[in-house]
Every structure is written in C-alpha cells, then in structure tokens.
Amino acid sequence: VIGDEDTVTGFLLGGIGELNKNRKPNFLVVEKETSVTEIEETFRSFLNRDDIGIILINQFIAEMIRHVIDTHTISIPAVLEIPSKEHPYDATKDSILRRAKGMFTMEDLR
C-alpha cells in the first residue's frame, strides 16, 4: 500500500501490513514532506518483490509518479489506484484501467 496516513492505517488495521525477510515493510505512508523520489523508489521496489502481488496506491499519489506507473506492463504485481478520504477516485485518470478497457470489446463484456 502506498497512500496517505488514513488509507494506510485502514489497511494495516485490516491486517495487510508486514515486513519481509529483509525487514522491509509492504507499505509507505506518504506525507507532505515525502519526496516524489522516495515514492518512485518505493513503488519500483514493490514491483520487484516476490511477496507482493497487488500494489494499492492512492490515485492522487499515483498522479505524482504517473510516468513510472505507465511503464509497468506486466500483470503481477497488479496496480490498483484507490481513492482517499480527501481525493475521490476518477476513472479517467487511471492509466491501468484505460489499458484494461482497451483489451476488451463490448461483445466481450456481454
């Protein structure tokens, strides 16, 4: 999970937070002072971890590193953009969703 404090705390309370064998957490709380570089590095490190199958990221944070997210083309780990308390979800900004929609025709969805 990469998100604001409320989002990450909610998922941690739900039991998804853990440390891997190298004592690295599977979450990042993004605060005002968190640099874009740190977010990018964390996202890239999550992509390379074999213990992570899904990366949940607040959409407003995904917008900060959109250029990195758009380069991710493999299905695992899946990247899901989620809303935060302060920022509602906007499907038009979700590049992963746009790519997925392009894979199917209307007949496939019937």
UniProtKB/Swiss-Prot annotation:
SUPFAM superfamilies: AtpF-like. Gene3D superfamilies: ATPase, V1 complex, subunit F (3.40.50.10580). One of its GO terms (cellular component) is membrane. PANTHER family: V-TYPE PROTON ATPASE SUBUNIT F, VACUOLAR ATP SYNTHASE SUBUNIT F. Pfam families: ATP-synt_F. V-ATPase is a heteromultimeric enzyme made up of two complexes: the ATP-hydrolytic V1 complex and the proton translocation V0 complex. The V1 complex consists of three catalytic AB heterodimers that form a heterohexamer, three peripheral stalks each consisting of EG heterodimers, one central rotor including subunits D and F, and the regulatory subunits C and H. The proton translocation complex V0 consists of the proton transport subunit a, a ring of proteolipid subunits c9c'', rotary subunit d, subunits e and f, and two accessory subunits. Keywords: Hydrogen ion transport, Ion transport, Transport. NCBIfam families: V_ATP_synt_F. Subunit of the V1 complex of vacuolar(H+)-ATPase (V-ATPase), a multisubunit enzyme composed of a peripheral complex (V1) that hydrolyzes ATP and a membrane integral complex (V0) that translocates protons. V-ATPase is responsible for acidifying and maintaining the pH of intracellular compartments and in some cell types, is targeted to the plasma membrane, where it is responsible for acidifying the extracellular environment. GO terms for molecular function: proton-transporting ATPase activity, rotational mechanism. It comes from Xenopus laevis (African clawed frog). Disulfide bonds: none annotated. This is V-type proton ATPase subunit F. InterPro entries: ATPase_V1-cplx_f_g_su, ATPase_V1-cplx_fsu_euk, ATPase_V1_fsu_sf. Belongs to the V-ATPase F subunit family.
